């Protein structure tokens, strides 16, 4: 059994797992790792202090300056964790860097801390000083160097000196506890995860700090304020999971998001598993709890990060900008999706037909074509759809809602696509051109129909009589001949028709409207076909 390394207590995420965390969870991860690292540093420094190597003030200074960050000269793929003193007489120089899944973190770069050693201040003499202005070198991968954080060469329990840290590592393994460590001074219980324990002699008599809440004595270098945070708001705040550290109050509410006690925790409500611990935010899905409320519109959310994203709608803030075209977004995920337009990347591939998509949601929608799944149902008529947007569009038929209005003529539509198509009438825009004859259309569907004239294709066949049509609407109209269905009824006289166009023509009898006018003689008609017949007179 070896001494503790940072990797023993670190939580590592795969790229896929990291993408599942929202910014608040990523920040919490960083804070937890920082506190774990500081605990390790404090234990290492205390080992030296207990041997009389460091004075008390030096320990306090060292702990305050212990920090976690990236090398200044490293890329975003490395996080820096500084190994303790290398050997007796080591001069000022750079410590090793651990490559620890930080390619997914967003912490700012920090200067590397070095240990200054010279003739006056050797490692095992009086006071090594942490400096924060030293330049840095490229990081060294974790798998190349496996340095220990605890570099004690003196065992307090047996009063034995060791010349090499590996020897004392083997020796110390005999003193480690396997599960829980109880402090006899304050009865605080620490869980020993991956051999992380807190020594009892933390309650030293040299200038102790006392907590006003519980009277517990803390060591001078571990910060009284950290100890006191446990008692803020409640007499005791503890995680009932097996955590490496006791979190500050700001972490207590959400620290279960990353619980390091188990590698996989299964959620009983739906059997969902979280590889790095039980996600507290997931529980809110089942409880319906939404503690984060927007002050502008009173909309509530179960995550603070979701509230932060929502508030950008009110402020208009769009902090995520595309470097290619300059387009800005209020969410990082939207920017990621947008950038795939420039790169042409289609990371989401259908296993059934091989079709690829640039968004996971598009793939999910597409897969319903293969499965036949239609999870979105209309509450009015029970009709089911494979997309939620289709239900929304369909429901407007029942409500009569037409939210999309033309600014030119005021005509309203129940679909945005219908408005777009309509606006081309005003602009004269005809994007869709036939390659055979050059005729252009303002709708893609119209071009598709037109092309069947050239190909002779009649895809829509009547099952009753076998008659085929080039347009689906023509087949629908034809089928009413067999069924006798007449949906379109005149409100004036009650006469019914199989086609809406026939009803429109009929209504002109009641209104007297004659929109079709002859250019030769000015005579007007209520039907186009009647005008066509009339124009033959002028051509004779």
From Swiss-Prot:
SMART domains: KRAB, ZnF_C2H2. Transmembrane segments: none annotated. One of its GO terms (molecular function) is DNA-binding transcription factor activity, RNA polymerase II-specific. It is found in: Nucleus. It holds the Pfam family KRAB. A zinc finger (C2H2-type) spans 181-203, 292-314, 320-342, 348-370, 376-398, 404-426, 432-454, 460-482, 488-510, 516-538. GO terms for cellular component: nucleus. Residues 4-78 form the KRAB domain. InterPro entries: Ikaros_C2H2-ZF, KRAB, KRAB_dom_sf, Znf_C2H2_sf, Znf_C2H2_type. GO terms for biological process: regulation of DNA-templated transcription. It comes from the Eukaryota. Keywords: DNA-binding, Metal-binding, Nucleus, Repeat, Transcription, Transcription regulation, Zinc, Zinc-finger. Belongs to the krueppel C2H2-type zinc-finger protein family. May be involved in transcriptional regulation. This is Zinc finger protein 519. It comes from Homo sapiens (Human). The gene is ZNF519.
């Amino acid at each position: 059994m070896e001494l503790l390394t940072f990797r023993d207590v670190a939580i590592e995420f795969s790229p896929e797992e990291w993408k599942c965390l929202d910014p608040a969870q990523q920040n919490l991860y960083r804070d937890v790792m920082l506190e774990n690292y500081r605990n390790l540093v404090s234990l290492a420094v205390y080992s030296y202090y207990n041997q009389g190597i460091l004075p008390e003030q030096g320990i306090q200074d060292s702990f305050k300056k212990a920090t976690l960050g990236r090398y200044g000269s490293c890329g975003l793929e490395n996080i820096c964790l500084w190994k303790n003193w290398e050997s007796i007489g080591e001069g000022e120089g750079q410590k090793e860097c651990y490559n620890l899944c930080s390619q997914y973190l967003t912490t700012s770069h920090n200067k590397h801390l070095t240990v200054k050693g010279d003739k006056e201040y050797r490692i095992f003499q009086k006071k090594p000083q942490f400096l924060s202005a030293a330049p840095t070198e490229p990081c060294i991968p974790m798998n190349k160097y496996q340095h220990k954080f605890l570099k004690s060469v003196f065992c307090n329990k047996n009063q034995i000196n060791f010349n090499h840290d590996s020897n004392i590592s083997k020796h110390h393994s005999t003193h480690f506890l396997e599960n829980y460590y109880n402090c006899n001074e304050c009865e605080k219980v620490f869980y020993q995860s991956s051999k992380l324990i807190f020594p009892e002699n933390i309650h030293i008599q040299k200038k102790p700090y006392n907590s006003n809440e519980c009277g517990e004595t803390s060591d001078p270098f571990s910060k009284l304020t950290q100890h006191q945070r446990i008692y803020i708001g409640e007499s005791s705040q503890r995680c009932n999971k097996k955590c490496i550290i006791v979190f500050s109050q700001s972490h207590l509410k959400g620290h279960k998001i990353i619980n390091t006690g188990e590698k996989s925790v299964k959620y009983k409500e739906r059997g969902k598993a979280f590889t790095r611990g039980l996600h507290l935010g997931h529980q809110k899905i089942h409880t319906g709890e939404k503690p984060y409320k927007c002050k502008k519109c009173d909309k509530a959310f179960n995550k603070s990060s979701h509230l932060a994203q929502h508030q950008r709608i009110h402020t208009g803030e769009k902090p995520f900008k595309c470097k290619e075209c300059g387009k800005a977004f209020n969410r990082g995920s939207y920017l990621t999706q947008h950038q795939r337009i420039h790169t042409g990347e289609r990371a989401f591939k259908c296993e059934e037909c091989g079709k690829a998509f640039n968004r996971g949601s598009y793939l999910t929608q597409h897969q319903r074509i293969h499965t036949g799944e239609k999870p979105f149902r209309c509450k009015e008529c029970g009709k089911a759809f494979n997309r939620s947007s289709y239900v929304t569009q369909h429901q407007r038929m029942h409500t009569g809602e037409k939210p999309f209005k033309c600014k030119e003529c005021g005509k309203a539509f129940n679909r945005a696509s219908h408005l777009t198509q309509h606006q081309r009438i005003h602009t004269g825009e005809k994007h869709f051109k036939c390659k055979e004859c050059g005729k252009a259309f303002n709708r893609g569907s119209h071009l598709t129909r037109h092309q069947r004239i050239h190909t002779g294709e009649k895809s829509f066949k009547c099952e009753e009589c076998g008659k085929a049509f080039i347009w689906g609407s023509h087949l629908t109209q034809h089928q009413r001949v067999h069924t006798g269905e007449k949906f379109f009824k005149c409100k004036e006289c009650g006469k019914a028709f199989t086609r809406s166009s026939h009803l429109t023509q009929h209504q002109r009898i009641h209104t007297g409207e004659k929109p079709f006018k002859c250019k030769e003689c000015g005579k007007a008609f209520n039907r186009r076909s009647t005008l066509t017949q009339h124009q033959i007179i002028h051509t004779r």
